[in-house]
Every structure is written in C-alpha cells, then in structure tokens.
Regions:
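Non-catalytic, usually N-terminal nucleic-acid engagement modules in DNA/RNA processing proteins
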Residues: 1-99
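Glycine-enriched alpha-helix->loop->beta-strand junction motifs that scaffold or abut catalytic
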Residues: 19-22, 39-41, 74-75, 100-104, ...
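Low-complexity, flexible helical/coil segments
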Residues: 37-39, 56-59, 77-83, 115-117, ...
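Conserved, mostly hydrophobic/aromatic
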Residues: 46, 107, 178
Length: 184
C-alpha cells in the first residue's frame, strides 16, 4: 500500500528529507505543492472538502479545477469534489462538473452512501476514494470495519477492479485484509 504523507509538513527542513515519497496536498493548504511535484514520487491533490467542512467554509469548485489543471499530469492525481455528509444526489451532481480525464481523478464514495452507488462508481471509474462518514465516521470501530468489509465484497463482484484510496484512515486501512492501493 502506498502511503501519502499529508502536507503541510513542518519544519520545512523535515519536508526536505522526504524526497521520493508520495504526498497529499490539499487545495485548502497548497503551499507545499510545487516542492512536492518537483521532489515527490507522486502527488495526490486533495479537493480540501474535509478541511472546508470542519471550518464551515465553502469552496469555489471552478477555482479548484483551475488549480488542478495547472498541475495534473502522470503520475499525479486528484480527489474530485465531494460533499461531506451530503447525499448521493449532491455528490453525483458534483461528479457531472468534472472536466478532467478520468485516469487522473477519483470520486469519493462515503461509507454512509449506498452500496449500489459504490457499485456504480466502481463500474465507471478506474480509481476511487473511500471516505469515513455518518454512522461509519470513526475509522477502526466495529461499524466501520463491517462497512469496509461490505464495500470490498461489493467491489469483488464488479466488472472493473478500481484502485481504492482510503482517506484519513491509514493505520486502520493497513490493519485489515482489504486490498487498498493507497492511504494517508
């Protein structure tokens, strides 16, 4: 499993020792992006939705897409806009705004959403992110583990086997038998 190191990393001298690693740079805290693109193995550009949600802030998704388009190229990729604790319709509406090639981006399936939505996303996208939410907001607890098991059982039955990144649950993702590709 690839571990994406969340930024910003301070002090700056600590970041300088991490050449060749994988990084996650948020739209809400983009200061380390240039360094990470130049020195990292790959960069996951995060949409910043979780940070905005915790602060009660709104994100202008056009500005996000402008930021991504300047920097998106192989092997880097981006987490598409999502609504934390939103419903499936709100998240599907945001996916319709995507203007980037699918091989470079990943939609978020929130654990409180239906397994049918997960199946649909898996059939349509080469890469997905899982986000802990709702009754499954606490990574590692019994409900969360059961839901992750259910999700992987669904993915095993899909025609496409997308790469899956577990958002904000690196330790828990690595403790199970789940074949996550990435985590942070």
């Amino acid at each position: 499993m690839l571990h994406y190191h969340g930024t910003p990393i301070t002090p700056r001298s600590a970041l300088a020792t991490m050449t060749g690693r994988h990084f996650c740079v948020s739209f809400m805290a983009p200061n380390d992006l240039t360094w990470c693109l130049q020195h990292g193995a790959s960069v996951m550009m995060d949409n910043g939705a979780f940070s905005a949600w915790t602060r009660g802030a709104k994100i202008d998704w056009n500005n996000f897409y402008d930021w991504i388009e300047l920097n998106l190229r192989h092997p880097h990729w981006a987490v598409l806009p999502d609504v934390i604790e939103g419903d499936e319709e709100a998240n599907d509406n945001l996916l319709m705004l995507n203007r980037l090639p699918r091989e470079y981006v990943a939609p978020v399936w929130h654990l409180h959403e239906s397994l049918d939505r997960l199946r649909k996303l898996a059939d349509e996208w080469p890469r997905l992110c899982f986000g802990s939410s709702g009754a499954f907001a606490t990574p590692g607890n019994e409900a969360w583990i059961k839901r992750i098991d259910e999700a992987w059982n669904v993915l095993e039955q899909t025609s496409r086997k997308p790469w899956v990144h577990m958002l904000r649950a690196m330790r828990e993702a690595s403790q199970g038998a789940w074949p996550f590709r990435f985590s942070r």
